[in-house]
Swiss-Prot record:
Protein's name according to its UniProt entry: Deoxyguanosinetriphosphate triphosphohydrolase-like protein
The organism's taxonomic lineage, starting at the top: Bacteria, Pseudomonadati, Pseudomonadota, Alphaproteobacteria, Hyphomicrobiales
Any one GO molecular function term: triphosphoric monoester hydrolase activity
HD domain boundaries: 75-219
Sequence similarity: Belongs to the dGTPase family. Type 2 subfamily.
PROSITE patterns associated with the record: HD (PS51831)
Keywords: Hydrolase
Length: 405
């Protein structure tokens, strides 16, 4: 049966000339026939959502250990919030919403259990073998470690989705291949040898809005969680002029508002103000650069979707507040130390005895491997663990208190 794509409207919304065009994608590593009902970027987004890696985000820490309360953000809730903001920005700028959403949904796939603490611990033990980088791990997951399809490993995402995943925070190299922020992780270089992601150029606008959406979501929900946990107070927020103005506005309009509603009214205004700031800056940037294609965006030599100077200063102030009052809070630091020990202990145990990993796939893969390859596979296994699973396995291996396990 023949399907009229334009009548369906799939992927044919109003796109600006500078938007990524799903019907002119640079393709997939393994060629596939197009879908009659979904654009290539829609298929990418759908594949991302149906992965085990996406489901695991539910039990991975954002800032607070997930077991400390059901109302704090996890990697999954953070990812959903980022995707919502990215899609709103993409719609406002006439970009491809599916690509922006897909990049937002996949951007945290490579995070370890226990957030950045777990990543730092895993990077430390893997330093002799190239270290660990969550962005490179995200690429490994979607190009190799997700094993769902009969014809290929990974998800076989489009070039544009993979480019956005790898470069959403900007170019990785100079034109002559020198790393801009240190050496480029080997998994990224290995993939680029097969499917060049052009590491020296900027990413699409869709990837840029996903990146700035990540900042907006972080700034907002970490304040919300910090207030809920008692690490932040409204008085602390008032030290930042931007937040003080929002608080004055809410108090003026809703005098005597209860704390939880007061917090929500501040947060929703913060998101709105930051989103509108990015839209305004992006529109001015587009007027300056005048890109006639997505290629022109990549060659612009600058980020287009970003904060204004004033909002960038607010962003800096908020991040400083979060660092001093939350991320370095004694209780958070105590939990971080324990989390780092769990990752380090498990790595050493699995390297000494791979059979402790239980899953036959991982054990079979490691058999007969040289140490560098074995270390990378153990790193893959550890990075894929959720907080709850890592704690459970560590308790089974290292806590000798008798119980039923």
């Amino acid at each position: 049966m023949t399907v009229d794509r334009q009548a369906l409207g799939f992927g044919y919304g109003e796109h600006a000339a500078y938007a990524s065009n799903p019907w002119a994608s640079r393709g997939r590593l393994y060629p596939e026939a197009s879908s009659p009902t979904r654009s290539d970027f829609q298929r990418d987004r759908d594949r991302i959502v149906h992965t085990t890696a996406f489901r695991r985000l539910k039990h991975k820490t954002q800032v607070f250990i997930a077991a400390d309360g059901d109302h704090y953000r996890t990697r999954l809730t953070h990812t959903i919030e980022v995707a919502q903001i990215a899609r709103a920005l993409a719609r406002a700028l006439n970009l491809d919403e599916d690509l922006a959403e897909g990049v937002a949904l996949v951007h945290d796939f490579g995070h370890t259990p226990f957030g950045h603490t777990g990543e730092d611990a895993l990077d430390e033990v893997l330093k002799p073998y190239g270290g660990f980088d969550h962005n490179a791990q995200s690429l490994r997951i979607v190009t190799k470690l997700e094993r769902r399809y009969a014809e290929f490993d990974g998800l076989n995402l489009t070039w544009e989705s993979l480019e956005g995943l790898v470069k959403h925070n900007g170019p990785l190299t100079t034109a002559d291949g020198q790393g801009l922020r240190g050496p480029v992780s080997q998994p990224i270089l290995d993939y680029c040898a097969l499917h060049d992601l052009e590491l020296a150029s900027f990413a699409s606008l869709e990837a840029q809005v996903a990146a700035i959406a990540d900042d907006i979501a972080y700034n907002t929900h970490d304040i919300d969680d910090g207030l809920r946990a008692g690490y932040l107070t409204f008085e602390m927020l008032e030290e930042i002029p931007f937040l003080a103005r929002l608080m004055y506005e809410v108090r003026d309009r809703y005098p005597g508002l209860e704390s939880s509603r007061f917090t929500h009214e501040i947060m929703r205004r913060q998101i709105t103000a930051m989103v509108e700031d990015v839209i305004g800056v992006s529109q001015r940037g587009l007027a300056d650069v005048r890109p006639a294609s997505a290629r022109d965006v990549r060659c612009a030599g600058r980020v287009i979707a970003t904060f204004s100077d004033e909002m960038s200063e607010t962003d800096r102030q908020i991040k400083n507040l979060l660092m001093t009052r939350i991320y370095r809070h004694p209780e958070v630091m105590r939990v971080r130390e324990g989390a780092a020990s769990i990752v380090t202990d498990l790595y050493r145990a699995f390297m000494d005895d791979p059979s402790l990993m239980k899953e036959h796939y991982w054990i079979d893969q490691i058999a007969g491997m040289e140490e560098p390859a074995r270390a990378r596979h153990v790193g893959d296994y550890l990075a894929g663990m959720t907080d709850t699973f890592a704690i459970s396995v560590h308790r089974r291996l290292f806590d000798h208190t008798p119980d039923l396990r």
